[in-house]
């Protein structure tokens, strides 16, 4: 019985570690977060702050405040500041992003903010 519990624990740790090792995908991981939390204000027909987040290319162009991402450096990326509760806090309307969503976006930026 103990060995079965140990095996399950080791399997859980291994699966958790492999999920962290997998690169963050813009289209699979981030696009759904942006769609749910950002696109009501940052889309082609309503670009608040002149920022369109509907596609990778438009998002990376940035808006009135410049590029939201400094690839490789989440701490210097405007989007991370805004979704981490700094002023102006984003999203303006609705609940703040969950910590795991902020972490995912930060990891993607640290990994180079690739279009994948």
Predicted segments, located by residue:
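Hydrophobic h-region of N-terminal signal peptides that target proteins for export
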Residues: 10-18
């Amino acid at each position: 019985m103990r060995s079965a519990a140990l095996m399950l624990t080791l399997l859980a740790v291994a699966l958790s570690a492999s999920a962290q090792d997998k690169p963050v995908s813009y289209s699979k991981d981030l696009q759904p977060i942006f769609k749910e939390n950002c696109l009501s204000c940052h889309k082609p027909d309503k670009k608040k702050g002149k920022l369109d987040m509907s596609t990778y290319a438009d998002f990376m162009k940035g808006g009135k405040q410049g590029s939201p991402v400094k690839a490789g450096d989440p701490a210097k990326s405007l989007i991370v500041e805004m979704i981490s509760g700094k002023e102006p806090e984003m999203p303006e309307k609705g609940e703040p992003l969950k910590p795991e969503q902020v972490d995912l976006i930060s990891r993607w930026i640290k990994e180079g903010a690739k279009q994948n």
